[in-house]
Amino acid sequence: MLEARDITFGYSKNMPIYQGFSLRIEPGERVALKAPSGFGKTTLCRMLSGYLQPAAGEILLDGQPLPRRGVCPVQMVWQHPETAVDPRMRMNATLAEAGVGDGTAKTVRDPSIEPEKAELLERLGIRDAWLTRFPHELSGGELQRFCIARALATKPRYVIADEMSTMLDALTQARIWHVLVEEVERSDAGLVFVSHSPALTARIATRVVELEG
C-alpha cells in the first residue's frame, strides 16, 4: 500500500498547501486526484513519488519510506516530458536507464532489448527511427511515449501520472492510456493520476479523491 501519512507541506511556512493530510492507495486501485487549478495536485504527485519531501509526516510504501537509491517502485510520468529526460542523451540511452536495451539499440527489436520490453515499445507506437534521436528531435507525444515506456519497464508497484496526456492529440491519448491501464492491471499495480477530462476520469478511475476543502 502507498500511503501519505499526516503530511504537511508548503512552499511558504505561513501558507501550507497540505496540513495533516493523509491518503492511502491500495494495489490495483486507480485513483484520480481532483481539485481546482493551483491547489497542489502536482505537489502531491511529486511527494508520492519521492521527488519532494514533506515538512512533516511520511510517504510510505508497505509501511516503509521510499528507497533513496536504486529504481524507485513508485514511478512518475510528468506533464512535460522534456523536463524528465537528459537533453544530451539519445532515446536509446534514455531507455537503457530503465533496463531497456544497452543504450545502442537502433531498432525496437534489437537483440539487446528483451522481447517483453520490445513489445511494450511497439504497443506504445515507438518507431525504430526515434531510438537514435535526441529529445529535441521528437514531438511532445513521441517523447511522452518514451517516458511511459521507461516508467513501465521498471515494473513499478505504483505509477503516478500528472496530466500526462494534456498536450497530446486524441488518438495518442487513447493509445497511451490504453497501454498504461493494461499494464497496471496486468501487474496489479496502483495508479494515481491527474486529469482535467471528466470523461477520462470516469472511464479509468476506480476512486476519485477530492482534495479541496
Q: Which sequence ranges carry the predicted segments?
A:
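Conserved ABC ATPase signature
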Residues: 134-138, 142
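Conserved ABC transporter NBD signature motif
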Residues: 57-70
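Helix-to-loop junction immediately C-terminal to a conserved catalytic motif
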Residues: 49
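Conserved ABC ATPase "signature" region
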Residues: 111-129
